[in-house]
Amino acid sequence: VYAILAPAIAGQFQDMKNTKIRGAFQALGFTDVREVAIGADLCTVEEAKDFLEEVPEKLPFMATSCCPSWSMMAKKLFPEQAKCISMALTPMVLTARLIKQKEPDCKIVFVGPCAAKKLEASRKSIRSYVDFVLTFEEVAGMFDAKGVDWKDIPEGEPLFRASADGRGFAVSGGVAQAVVHAVKRIDPERVVKVVNAEGLLNCKKMLQMAKAGKYNGYLMEG
């Protein structure tokens, strides 16, 4: 059973060091842990390629797809703009798929800040990759119930191996920033205009502006 950890794991638990994360989750019974930021790096490259190929020739703008709440809201309330939502798999799914390609019979538990990931993982197309989803709050309860004290966990191999851009997915605007950096690596001359919003109400307003043509050519993050 593998725990795959969202980039937002950093700073979630008192006395947590990245050299102790693996040992702490193994104390809960997990075989090992992987960082979802690795999947974020893969997602970044895919979205950068899509942006270069699609915008503005085929699509007026492109919106990132990593947040299920944002993606579902956009597709439900603005169906005519649904084609502008990136089709890239989320970092959670990409990370889980990497592990299951090597160990098909293993179980994958995603650990992150957002309960909406439970809904994403319940989709038929994703169930074969992600078996369970736990929030940080739920994992904190497991640490308490198991009596795991971070201070007592021995130092081990550092967990974080993904790029700074991949880990930056946890920060507002971090997804778009990572995609912009990837676009620049592919096409240094390409100028990428970015707009982002926090909270579903602000995301809705942003999509209304996009529908009105205010963000043509933009990379959008919700």
Please identify what each model-predicted range represents.
Residues 1-222:
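Iron-sulfur-associated redox domains of electron-transfer enzymes in respiratory
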